Amino acid sequence: MNAVDLIVEDDAWSSLAGKTRLVEEAISAACKELPDRTPGVVAILLGGDEGVASMNAQFRGKAGATNVLSFPAGEHADNHLGDIALAHGVIQREAEDRDIALADHLRHLIIHGFLHLQGFDHQQDDEAEVMEAIERRALARLGVADPYPNEDPGPGPHSE
């Protein structure tokens, strides 16, 4: 499994019990779906909308907060795979809008961010299908419902 460095920057996350375990289990589930993954330490920032909005503007040139940002460390990072930043307010609103638990939505977005650190993307439909299939399998390992219930699961790499 990849090691996790969890940083809780926003007090809004204090109401979520078992954060460390949740984060580690999400990364572990993703790792089980990626036998050829790149090892290394993943830093996960549980932040607020304002901080993530600032990063989104600075690094992507986009205004406003987004749910998750991934920052791959690159080739010369000595065991640091990259960083994942998550915005509490955005994630909370999305979970409420979708009528799902905050913890389950967070698990999904951690797995999603980790896949970006592993080189996966979803710019093209075929890439999105592969990425979503891995997300579905990793979440199923955690007992989390399919986050894409109205979409065809599409093909994906098999872990067994």
Swiss-Prot record:
Residue ranges the record marks as coiled coil: none
Cofactor: Zn(2+)
Gene Ontology MF term list: metalloendopeptidase activity; RNA endonuclease activity; zinc ion binding
InterPro entries named among the record's database cross-references: MetalPrtase_cat_dom_sf_prd, YbeY, YbeY_CS
Cellular component per GO, a single term: cytoplasm
Subcellular location(s) per record: Cytoplasm
Assigned protein family: Belongs to the endoribonuclease YbeY family.
Protein name stated in the entry: Endoribonuclease YbeY
Organism: Maricaulis maris (strain MCS10)
Chain's gene name: ybeY
